[in-house]
């Protein structure tokens, strides 16, 4: 009898993966609804609300308000007290998080299908905060501590400098984490004005993974998101890449970043090409496991140069611009030598073809599809596209775009990015740091 029971369970546990499909609809109130269905085992739903606001939209006076909104995400609103919001999420067995970036704010939940309407209500309620004084005060105090920790992280600090230098302190160059001195000046009125300017249906994208599109629309139409009667709006200046250099003396190993303007998220063809170029360069970490970039150019570079502790290519995309480059940690007064080696690898990578190109494309596709196995990662993947473009690709469709990348595409994007002034940031021993002009002279493609 036990044997028959076990056999019966095995015969009913086979899962046939279905094709993943993205659908998008804009409701009458301006709210954009995007869904990804198919291809996931287990009964779970991920819901996310993207708000088109980030540190790039802040000013000198409003710096830090985006962080405050993130901190207030699960606090009191017009329907529930903060403790009720948090308990509601916990009791339902759901998980939630909020994250602020340079050009968007994401509030997300993962729950069971039978709780989806309840959690969707919670998402909608978040966009109608009551902002009691003590909550604004407490959240601001927490953010001050987060800012202190962020500023003490060497890699976070250097990427702040990269953005600030590349965009000359405007738009994407504004600090992701506001200066601590500014956070102490934030008032409830300032937060209220920011809420009224950002929490509007036309400024939001609702993303669902694991819930049918029609069901998501039906449930979204039952609730109210934000204030669609607000006439206020935030500034939305177009990002202008400028480039330049920033040198800061510090003891210990030196950190070097050589960056260029990348591509905007909306340019899918170039996003695919830059993603492959990133895989060609890869990373140079002594602990890199087989199959995780040990054939990349930067791995070989780091392995063959004892002064380079580690190195890694990065590719950051935003709504209207991006940053592509290499970050490295080096020992001694070898910054100049390291930058020359990096420029040589970039020039060589621009000429990649044949087996090396195919291997880089395979690595890139594997990374994209592996990340998509997580509902939350898939939500972020399609949500970020939905903010900036009407055409949203599934992970598999983006993998197809990667397959189409040719050696000419790699050469084209590499030539395009190196045609503008690079951004060079050095923190450490700056005694032999090269000039921007000398770096440019080495980038002849």
Swiss-Prot record:
Molecular function via GO: metal ion binding
Range of the transit peptide: 1-13
Keywords (A to Z) from UniProt: Mitochondrion, Transit peptide
Record-level GO BP terms: protein processing involved in protein targeting to mitochondrion; response to bacterium
Primary location class: mitochondrion
Residues spanning the membrane: none
Subunit description: Heterodimer of alpha and beta subunits, forming the mitochondrial processing protease (MPP) in which subunit alpha is involved in substrate recognition and binding and subunit beta is the catalytic subunit.
Protein name: Mitochondrial-processing peptidase subunit alpha-2
UniProt source species: Dictyostelium discoideum
